[in-house]
Amino acid sequence: MSRVAKAPVVVPAGVDVKINGQVITIKGKNGELTRTLNDAVEVKHADNALTFGPRDGYADGWAQAGTARALLNSMVIGVTEGFTKKLQLVGVGYRAAVKGNVVNLALGFSHPVDHQLPAGITAECPTQTEIVLKGADKQVIGQVAADLRAYRRPEPYKGKGVRYADEVVRTKEAKKK
């Protein structure tokens, strides 16, 4: 049995938590995040900490409580520190630029690729081959990074494409004659 739910989530100073039934709203310096929790989870806010437990009558109560604890911990970290995700473009002529809330990509297609960023996510390009995504919602940051990577995934022979900064691309050997 996992014991993730047994550890409380510490709520730092400057973070406001509102519990309205199963809807939890966490507000901090980086914004406001809201999440609806599973009915099997019971949340209590006391002494600058959130504690989690299962409700009676649910077989998967502890599992859902552990999931809820992990999600709310990510929300607290997001509204205090924020999350970043870095992408690299590898390939001749592969370039990225940010104009407002649109990421412009040149990925070897016959047309440029424009990706609209969702609300709460900012992007910057320190160089033409790097993209840095920042925001408070961990799930949305990961989804935007996955969407950008999906335009041109790293191919296995030369490794060209859009990759995460910490991703290791396994390359294959070329066909032997």
Swiss-Prot record:
Keywords: Ribonucleoprotein, Ribosomal protein, RNA-binding, rRNA-binding. One of its GO terms (molecular function) is rRNA binding. InterPro entries: Ribosomal_uL6-like (IPR000702), Ribosomal_uL6-like_a/b-dom_sf (IPR036789), Ribosomal_uL6_a/b-dom (IPR020040), Ribosomal_uL6_bac-type (IPR019906), Ribosomal_uL6_CS (IPR002358). Signal peptide: none annotated. The keyword Ribonucleoprotein applies. This protein binds to the 23S rRNA, and is important in its secondary structure. It is located near the subunit interface in the base of the L7/L12 stalk, and near the tRNA binding site of the peptidyltransferase center. Belongs to the universal ribosomal protein uL6 family. This is Large ribosomal subunit protein uL6. The gene is rplF.
